[in-house]
């Protein structure tokens, strides 16, 4: 090893470039490996996980909790059922207002699943409606002395005898980890609590057909999936969702694959933990390509420097070492070098872990997940990568006879091999990665900047307004309008950037229509700048073009009446189509919207909206100038009226950006990979050009002696690099045309190939190639030819 260390010391550029390349690529592989391990091991601790299925349909993996008991009574293949729902909640704990997320579950939750219960009897902790189980993290936060069991938690106004519910903590569970249930859910209560959070999720009519994730446990030896057709027919007799053919299939998704395979599976408090299997595979492929890229660099540079160690290897052969012994020595050195790079990569991965968690929005813990089996895997990876990286240079050095090295024929043969092909491959990879990144980045930015059909800039929204009386709402608006920064205050039930109330029905031709209700007062619609294209009367509802299209009506229709009698309303106004939530969703599934607009919400028992949904739930405030001042005033007024801490105010612009977070994360990861790939490519090209020019120093010196111009020598050297770049471009263009739409479809984007990103990528890679070669060539051309000839 002593001679190897001397070699690394003499060639510091070689050492640095290979350490950087292997280190960064393996660090990414470590992080991605931990990410995928955690994703693929979600819920794998469930002892009956293979027998537990989530009930759903072709549209979403959700149902109503009352369906569970009906199916169990009908189908003996079902051993048990358990429903899970999630809500945002605000509690009073010893006078402190606490915001958290809560699960409303069937009483058998801790018997059905293997989530660890640290304190309490799993058969009894949720048998009463007022019992609550809290997470270890939640208990430690509010009862650090460890005496949480038996304490009371109050939902609602504790000073109002009819307006609050008191829960008693009956047990403590471990925090949710490697589960489809987000760890932000810290409290668990009996399903009777649906009445306090979402009454439509409790009613026997099962109006809220997707209020719960319903799990069915199959009896051992049974085949529950063979009963899906029978389940569908049975549910047509009692479940309106199937009776009116709003959905046509029954799906059973195993708990073990729910993380990847669930469709539209969420709680009211947010989505369940989920992943995209194709995207995970794409990340791994890219990371492996970056590693291959780094190995190419190692091979390329090692081959270029084989002549530097040729005399050493010739001497070893002459001293009695066999060809195999020389080969194994070189492979051992490569594995040792890879092991050093891997050690550094592990430390780099630990340093980048928090940033990776933020970008991937998925928990990782590399240190915690490193066990004996993992370490054995690491050793195998080091051995394989080291052997692959060292195979080619070891084969070359051990394959020639010592006499070839003494004569100098070895040097002449090696100079012409490997480097050209590997440099072309590097350039191809760089062009394709850069093209895909630029194209997807431009596509996402374009969609984010696309007009939505309404205003969202300089608008704040806040919820909980349903806690205010009519007089308080009027005073709230009046006092805010007294501020010079406030331009308007409107009340409603949600903006197009929120989850709007919906009603699923059926048109006469059998088309299932899932309408969204956009409801607000006149100020609400003025602030959003949503106005009708046509107004027919003062009574009735507004509709957009998409709603008319789905019911098979023309744009001048004045009413919609279905033969079944489910729908019968008068059209007062026609509104333009608007984007509901994201452009991507709207492109796939245009949203029919029913608009209910009133001058002002009063306590009107005859109002359909207020009878169904209660008082207005939220306010939007149009402002200019100092946002913090307006936000502060909103909080002060809410607390003054209710005595409770005000919910956070959010800007609609921020909510608009949040809808694109998944796409932004994907783009961020892809950008990082591209940057690393380009960095490795640039370093490799710099080194290769340096060694390539270095090997031709004698030729350059001889040409200088015979009077060649510096420019002609430089251009002659650059010709090879330009040809390599052109060959790379020819290969990269069809690859980019194929890969960009594929990567886009995996991330949920419809991407069409554009010329400019491809052209820009070609120019960037060509400039980097030519510039690095030009600098090295110019330095070689301007060097004193005497030194080059003397050294040869």
Which residues are covered by each model-predicted region?
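Membrane-helix entry/capping segments
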Residues: 6, 10-12, 46, 235-287, ...
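Membrane-proximal extracellular/periplasmic loop immediately following the first transmembrane helix
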Residues: 32-90, 94-96, 202-203, 208-215, ...
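C-terminal transmembrane helical bundles of large multi-pass transporters
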Residues: 644-729, 742-745
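Alpha-helical transmembrane segments of integral membrane proteins
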Residues: 1-19, 269-272, 302-332, 339, ...
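Transmembrane alpha-helical interface segments in multi-pass membrane proteins
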Residues: 16, 21, 312-354, 677, ...
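Mid-to-C-terminal secondary-structure elements
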Residues: 106-119, 132-275, 475-478, 482-658
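Hydrophobic alpha-helical transmembrane segments of multi-pass inner-membrane transport and secretion
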Residues: 10-39, 274-311, 339, 343, ...
